């Protein structure tokens, strides 16, 4: 008895907020995997932050917030630009123990300018079978993101 539900919000055509929900009574470990571009990474395992550090005016900031204790781990990652030739690339996973209660994570993917400092917070306001409400703050700008399925039974 396990359901994975993912909601993707594209906020103001600027950044993505992804909400992953692991629902049901199944037990084990919930893993969110991130395969990234083959560039240098700056990783903060305590805050669950991954930043690309490319020789570019723009990079990617990724942070995952969870309702439960989570662990950010480096893992093996590969990519291929040519058939039958694979090369290593950075890959990470967020790992969370799953019991009977739901596990929910909120991930920000934000295009970051050089020398930016991104501040991100997220809170699940409501979540059930028919609705999701999440409140996020990115660099002090608050947004309420939600969906609601109305059923006529």
Regions found by a protein language model. Name each.
Residues 1-153:
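CBM-like, beta-strand-rich accessory domains located in the C-terminal region of large
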């Amino acid at each position: 008895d396990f359901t994975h539900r993912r909601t993707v919000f594209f906020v103001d055509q600027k950044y993505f907020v992804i909400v992953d929900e692991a629902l049901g009574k199944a037990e084990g470990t919930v893993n969110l995997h991130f395969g990234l571009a083959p560039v240098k990474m700056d990783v903060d395992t305590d805050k669950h932050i991954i930043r690309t550090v490319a020789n570019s005016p723009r990079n990617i900031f990724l942070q995952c917030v969870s309702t439960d204790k989570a662990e950010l781990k480096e893992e093996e990652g590969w990519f291929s630009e040519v058939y039958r030739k694979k090369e290593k690339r950075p890959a990470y996973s967020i790992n969370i123990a799953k019991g009977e209660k739901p596990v929910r994570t909120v991930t920000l993917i934000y295009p970051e300018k050089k020398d930016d400092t991104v501040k991100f917070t997220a809170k699940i306001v409501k979540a059930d079978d028919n609705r999701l409400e999440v409140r996020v703050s990115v660099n002090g700008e608050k947004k309420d993101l939600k969906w609601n399925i109305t059923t006529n039974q």
